[in-house]
Amino acid sequence: MRILVAIEPVDGRKGIDSLVQLCREKLSADPFSGCLFFFRSRRATSLRVLAYDGQGFWLAQKRLSKGRFVWWPSGSEPARTLEAYQAQLLLAAGNPDTLAAPLWRRVDAPAS
């Protein structure tokens, strides 16, 4: 599966239709290709993932409870391709280049 990360941050209020248009116009990519598209908010506190599954679009968002996404690709191209393990690190607010992610507070199971 191809994973594209948009270099430029996007307005966090954008919905599926706006992100599909952004994929076409800014990233020169087909949003119906089955590719995962990653977008970061301007404040770097949330990350959105857009995907098409053959029937419709999925839009998922992760908002950090604390801190910011410190790593994000840069460059002259509109997007960067990531491998699956790099995307997993990115979702954990880590750095795919150094293969490191920050430690977060532990979530205990609810008492029964």
PLM regions with names:
Residues 1-112:
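Polybasic/polar functional segments that serve as interface/processing modules
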